[in-house]
């Protein structure tokens, strides 16, 4: 007989066979199989357990499993190397206790060893067995009242689940296969037991090592921390009393998904907190979002601490306590999509944020893409202009040179979660993350449930209905299309629109749901300061303030009254906010616009606009902050002014281009031309290191290579044709417009912008060339070119309309009389006509000059010269 050794009883295979742990030294623990000497208990068998097999095992389990005990080996079977001996504590001997309860019997081959210390032990065992036999205990009594155990899985798992779902069932953990899968004996009644396989709900553990025990099986290595997770559960649950909650069937349809509750708590939470498992996303339907969220919180802490399977994870947690990242209140200024917003903080700073863990209808998805505008409109109506509470969840790093963006939880004042509201309505999907992802919404599982409910309820883009908005037309695409839409847009006096974009203080891009179209709109009767079109330009004073006020309308509902449309397809009229507030008056009252009447403006509105502007001037607000009212001039000064004769302005010029509409561009001969020649030479050297611009926009100052002479010129982009990769560029030193490929356009360095554009735009005074529709149009342009191009001319400025001068052109070699001017020569040659009186308002009328021109015109008419050859062609004047 060996000495007693202190050990820990790990597992009771039966009433008399155990797995024990013996500590060999400070670090090494040996596990071995050990059986009680001299006795045997009823056996568990595949074909059916012997009576009282469970009772014997349960008796031993309750007494010694999980507890320290003294173990002494009495003998060893040579063939199996199994040790047999005694297990005892300070209170009892296990074999003797089993015999006394009738749960074991002496082995037939066991005999007394007279004269040895074992003899007295054997005698005590015999006495214990005699006691059980005398009182007919256990196996010595009737066997009709024993436990019946069903070892096979339930024949109908779904029916079994339905019968026991929601109940708390007592049981014992029999075996542990992986960290997240156990075999449990359920106590359906005191004498009716059922063995089932339970997968832990809410957690997925790495696979442990598996050793094949038959040819049909395949051994496998553990996943990282797989054996550690299994051992974690073994030490806490193996042959322990637990409470089981069945929740659902496992995917295999045979085993069950459930909670395994130890007196210390749910084992799943302990696995997650130790980093030995990850949250199983697909268990949300069984557990519900509240439980899943609590599990994710536990998992997140393990990730941050890099425990277990998260040891090597790359975790980037934002400093939520940082001042710039704290929760803040803001107003929604723009809804870009159902997952991206722009909000304005209380300090006026606007920032772009994304709603955590959701995605708007994807353009690449054929089923989702048609609902993009409908989804955005749903959210816009709910939150635009409203105050919200923003909480940072995580920061998503920027990609493709884009900045990082804050992913946040946004709540309305009543506590409504915006992301949850959108997903419930079927206008966004929930992002599926990788299992090692830390960054996700704190209500991620609620979002998953909401998405599932929206799909089942056929809401939003899951409805299968036709999208509310499709095939939207751009009514301002061209002048022709805008005029086609004018009557339909004017049919409703106040047309309901949505302000899609703000171009300037008085210019907007609107969307009309009723007419299913977009269009450009400008406030009639006012002008606002011009904003800078690019970084190289400088806006007019108070342009930003005017634009800022106009942006308060962005994505808000408004009403517009359409009055007319201009030649660029922009509709003109009045815009009203809050149904009755004219926005033009608001701009005028704050000194951010000035009056500019129009022909059809009513006297009432004209007076109202001017009175509002006058009040702003008097209050010195906005652009009128330094306004000084004009003083009344003395009578003598007025008289002198009346008698003063205006000196005519003469310019030495050279024509640089003749446009198709009869206007022409000229350069003033002087220092400007000399500076331009130097600049053109420098541009030629810049061509050697030419690099096309990556981004080309309308209004951009550029250096462009002309296709006519392959030279480089300064210019301004007028129109971009993205489809053909070309742009219409005004070469503003010469006045010509060319279509130039993007590959021949580069940004213009600031050093080349100091010299102002050298070309001036002009038209001939008193006369007009035939229109492009005339058969004589090309002939007239050719004659004009022969008379004026490549010659030093003198231009007498007669007036101007905007930036277009009205001039009389003289060729010094022809003479200085008016009858010798190019204007008169064109009329005499029948290549131009005297303009009607209604078109002479932009320059001073010279009666003598007009008489000369009319004489030339009458002579050409009578002699059938030029376009008078077949009679009177002047019907085009009307």
Swiss-Prot record:
GO terms for molecular function: nuclease activity; RNA binding. One of its GO terms (cellular component) is cytosol. Its main location: cytoplasm. The modification Phosphoserine is found at residue 316. Residues 695-755 form the Tudor domain. InterPro entries: Silence_cplx_Nase-comp_TudorSN (IPR016685), SNase_OB-fold_sf (IPR035437), Staphylococal_nuclease_OB-fold (IPR016071), Tudor (IPR002999). One of its GO terms (biological process) is regulatory ncRNA-mediated gene silencing. It is found in: Cytoplasm, Cytosol. Keywords: Cytoplasm, Phosphoprotein, Repeat. CDD domains: SNc (cd00175). This is Staphylococcal nuclease domain-containing protein 1. The gene is snd1.
């Amino acid at each position: 007989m060996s000495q007693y050794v202190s050990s820990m009883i790990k597992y009771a295979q039966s009433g008399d066979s155990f797995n024990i742990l013996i500590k060999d030294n400070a670090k090494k623990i040996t596990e071995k199989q050990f059986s009680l000497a001299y006795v045997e208990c009823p056996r568990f068998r595949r074909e059916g357990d012997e009576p009282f097999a469970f009772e014997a095992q349960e008796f031993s389990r309750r007494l010694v499993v999980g507890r320290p005990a003294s173990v002494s080996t009495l003998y060893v079977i040579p063939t199996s190397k199994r040790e047999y001996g005694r297990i005892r504590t300070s209170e009892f001997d296990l074999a003797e206790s089993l015999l006394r309860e009738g749960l074991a019997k002496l082995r037939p081959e066991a005999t007394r060893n007279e004269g040895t210390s074992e003899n007295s032990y054997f005698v005590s065992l015999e006495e214990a067995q005699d006691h059980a036999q005398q009182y007919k205990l256990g196996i010595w009594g009737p066997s009709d009242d024993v436990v019946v155990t069903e070892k096979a899985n339930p024949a109908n798992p779904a029916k079994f689940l339905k019968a026991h779902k929601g109940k708390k069932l007592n049981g014992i953990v029999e075996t542990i296969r992986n960290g997240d899968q156990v075999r449990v004996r359920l106590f359906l009644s005191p004498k009716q037991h059922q063995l089932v396989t339970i997968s832990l709900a809410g957690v997925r553990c790495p696979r442990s090592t598996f050793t094949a025990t038959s040819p049909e099986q395949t051994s496998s290595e553990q996943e990282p921390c797989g054996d550690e997770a299994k051992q974690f559960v073994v030490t806490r649950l193996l042959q322990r009393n637990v409470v089981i909650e069945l929740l659902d069937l496992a995917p295999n349809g045979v085993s069950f998904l459930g909670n395994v509750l130890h007196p210390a708590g749910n084992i799943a939470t302990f696995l997650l907190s130790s980093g030995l498992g990850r949250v199983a996303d697909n268990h949300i339907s069984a557990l519900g979002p509240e439980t899943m969220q609590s599990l994710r919180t536990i998992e997140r802490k393990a990730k941050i601490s890099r425990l277990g399977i998260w040891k090597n994870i790359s975790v980037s947690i934002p400093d939520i306590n940082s001042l710039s990242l704290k929760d803040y209140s803001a107003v929604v200024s723009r809804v870009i999509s159902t997952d991206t917003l722009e909000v304005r903080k209380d300090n006026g700073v606007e920032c772009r944020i994304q709603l955590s863990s959701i995605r708007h209808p994807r353009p690449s998805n054929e089923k989702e893409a048609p609902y993009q505008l409908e989804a955005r409109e749903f959210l816009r109506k709910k939150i635009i202009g409203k105050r919200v509470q923003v909480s940072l969840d995580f920061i998503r790093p920027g990609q493709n040179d884009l900045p990082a963006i804050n992913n946040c939880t946004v709540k309305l004042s009543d506590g409504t979660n915006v992301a949850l509201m959108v997903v419930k309505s079927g206008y966004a999907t929930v992002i599926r993350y990788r299992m090692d992802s830390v960054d996700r919404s704190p209500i991620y599982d609620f979002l998953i449930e909401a998405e599932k409910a929206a799909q089942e309820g056929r809401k939003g883009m899951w409805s299968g209905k036709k999208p509310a908005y499709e095939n939207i037309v751009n009514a301002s695409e061209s002048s022709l299309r805008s005029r086609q839409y004018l009557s339909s847009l004017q049919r409703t006096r106040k047309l309901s629109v949505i302000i899609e974009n703000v171009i300037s203080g008085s210019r907007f891009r609107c969307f009309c749901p009723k007419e299913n179209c977009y269009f450009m709109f400008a406030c009639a009767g006012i002008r606002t300061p011009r904003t800078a079109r690019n970084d190289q330009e400088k806006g007019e004073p108070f342009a930003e303030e005017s634009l800022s006020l106009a942006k308060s309308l962005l994505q808000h509902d408004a009403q517009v009254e359409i009055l007319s449309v201009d030649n660029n397809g922009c509709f003109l009229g009045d815009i009203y906010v809050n149904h009755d507030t004219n926005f033009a008056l608001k701009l005028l009252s704050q000194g951010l616009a000035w009056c500019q009447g129009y022909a059809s403006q009513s006297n009432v509105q004209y007076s109202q606009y001017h009175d509002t502007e006058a009040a702003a001037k008097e209050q010195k607000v906005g652009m009128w902050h330094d306004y000084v009212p004009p003083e009344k001039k003395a009578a003598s000064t007025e008289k002198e002014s009346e008698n003063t004769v205006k000196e005519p302005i003469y310019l030495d010029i050279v024509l640089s281009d003749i446009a198709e509409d009869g206007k022409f561009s000229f350069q003033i001969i002087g220092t400007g031309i000399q500076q331009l020649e130097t600049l053109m030479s420098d541009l030629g050297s810049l061509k050697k290191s030419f690099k096309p611009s990556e981004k080309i926009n309308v209004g951009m100052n550029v250096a462009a290579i002309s296709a006519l002479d392959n030279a480089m010129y300064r210019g301004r982009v007028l129109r971009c044709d993205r489809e053909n990769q070309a742009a219409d560029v005004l070469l503003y030193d010469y006045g010509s417009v060319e279509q130039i490929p993007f590959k021949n356009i580069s940004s213009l360095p600031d050093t080349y912008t100091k010299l102002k554009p050298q070309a001036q735009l002009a038209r001939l005074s008193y006369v007009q060339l035939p229109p492009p529709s005339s058969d004589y149009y090309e002939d007239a342009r050719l004659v004009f070119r022969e008379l004026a191009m490549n010659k030093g001319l003198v231009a007498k400025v007669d007036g101007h309309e905007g930036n277009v001068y009205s001039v009389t052109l003289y060729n010094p070699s022809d003479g200085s009389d008016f009858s010798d001017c190019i204007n008169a020569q064109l009329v005499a040659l029948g290549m131009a006509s005297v303009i009607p009186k209604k078109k002479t308002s932009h320059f001073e009328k010279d009666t003598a000059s007009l008489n000369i021109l009319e004489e030339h015109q009458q002579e050409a008419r009578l002699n059938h010269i030029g376009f008078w050859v077949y009679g009177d062609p002047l019907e085009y004047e009307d």
